[in-house]
Amino acid sequence: MLHREDDEGLIVVSQPAHAWVAGQMARQWGNAEFGEFAPHEEVCLAAEQHDIGWLQWEQAPTLNVKTGRPHTFMELAVPTHTAMWSSAEPLSLQYGRYPALLVSMHGTGLYEKYHDSSKDSSDDLEAIDDFLTAAHAFQEGLLCDLREDPLFSRHATLETITRNQRLVAVWDWLSLILCMGLKEKRKIDDVPVAKGKGKTLQLTPVNGDGNEVRISPWPFKRVTLTLRCEGRRLPGKWKDCLKMREALQSAPWVPIQIELRA
């Protein structure tokens, strides 16, 4: 779950809804400067389903007693977080091997590249190690299988897999920034391009509500792009998790529309 603030207060957006936005961008991604990617449908599906492991938790989110609000994805305990990423593997595998591989690699990439373990407990470190060990074995099995498949072998090279993994990470980060409401300039480095080293995307909000954003250089096929998802208006704060969940179940839906342009 992520939080989006506007003039009326808090909007909560589920991780699967945010992932859908990542998938919307994936399907419109690519031009002369940023190139294409393959296998197109499988990579788009991985982007769209990369947070499939959150589905169960989002139905009964936990309460952050310090804030009085539902936990965001950044506030959950490590064992809870790694368990969700572990559950994503068998769920995403129902869609196929290639999307499952990218979903799993996205999860391990988050811990290997971005997680700060300096304050983790011994239990946290053990949970991370167990998760990474099992996930790498899962990935290796899929890679061996895909490399023996005539349809997928050319898409299972280290170069192609690495590029596709990075694209999913870029779309994830873009979607998080946009769904949380962009208030100030941001950038995303090392974005894969058609040729040469990756480029840096500059994101600039046009207004104060984060509903219109300029991106440079422009990475999409269309000259403009409209993204959509839904959140729920959740006013107030709670001390009781069950009451928070009851309020969330009856909270009004809020359509979110974000316009991207060069």
Please annotate each region the language model reported.
Residues 123-262:
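Non-catalytic terminal regions of proteins
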Residues 7, 28, 32, 37, ...:
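Sparse, context-dependent recognition of short Cys/His-centered cofactor- or disulfide-binding micro-motifs
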